[in-house]
């Protein structure tokens, strides 16, 4: 019976995590309609403008484009660093609704990559598949993952890039690691301490 419970717990956590992620993050159950894909509007507007050769950092030009998809709630400027531009453009090249669903699907993939990374690292640290599977299930159940997916944010992209960038950097694959860490730098505040740590460990090639 104990063995059966050990198998059942991580499986249940993974299935429950996927249920929460898809139900509240993808489908949007229990969330206000105005909340869904809200942050994606900034990303799409910037990418759409960049494809047209316009400056997304000019608020007077940016605001009308943003208002065309979010109405009167457009208050903040586009504040991401320039190297998010190519990523934003692949959303902006699509109609708004289709682009939003593309990012939603990508956020599900990023969540799975995070869960896979957690599984791998915990298994390496403990040597136990059970602990690793349980940790991965808890990662999938994280309410923040569903929240970010529903809003259309980039935090899951940043987290997945940071985790796997760190992994490859410490396995002497600085090019892959460096590219992933550069992607994570679209939110620089999450990269300050990891970069300091890498420098202290003489991993500055990344």
Where would I find each of the regions flagged by the language model?
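TM-lumen/periplasm interface segments of multi-pass membrane proteins
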Residues: 17-124, 128
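Specific aromatic-rich, kink-prone transmembrane helix
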Residues: 117, 157-173
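Start-transfer (signal-anchor) and selected internal transmembrane alpha helices
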Residues: 1-26, 132-134
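Perimembrane helix-loop-helix junctions
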Residues: 192-206
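Transmembrane helix irregularities
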Residues: 94, 141, 169, 183-187, ...
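Transmembrane and membrane-interface helices of multi-pass
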Residues: 125, 130-145
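Short acidic/glycine- and proline-prone juxtamembrane loop motifs at membrane-interface regions
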Residues: 149-155
């Amino acid at each position: 019976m104990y063995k059966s419970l050990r198998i059942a717990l991580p499986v249940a956590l993974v299935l429950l995590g996927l249920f929460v992620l898809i139900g509240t993050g993808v489908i949007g159950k229990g969330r206000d309609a105005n909340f869904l894909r809200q942050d994606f509007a900034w990303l799409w507007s910037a990418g759409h403008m960049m494809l047209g050769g316009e400056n997304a950092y000019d608020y007077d030009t940016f605001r009308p484009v943003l208002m065309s998809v979010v109405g009167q709630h457009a208050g903040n400027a586009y504040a991401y660093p320039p190297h998010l531009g190519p990523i934003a453009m692949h959303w902006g090249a699509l109609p708004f609704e289709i682009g939003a669903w593309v990012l939603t699907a990508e956020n599900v993939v990023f969540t799975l990559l995070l869960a896979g990374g957690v599984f791998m690292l915990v298994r390496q640290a403990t040597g136990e598949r059970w602990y690793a599977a349980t940790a991965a299930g808890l990662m999938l159940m994280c309410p923040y993952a569903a929240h970010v997916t529903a809003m259309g944010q980039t935090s899951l992209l940043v987290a997945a890039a940071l985790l796997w960038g760190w992994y490859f950097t410490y396995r002497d694959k600085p090019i892959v690691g460096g590219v992933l860490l550069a992607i994570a730098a679209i939110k620089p505040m999450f990269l300050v301490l990891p970069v300091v740590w890498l420098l202290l460990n003489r991993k500055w090639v990344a």
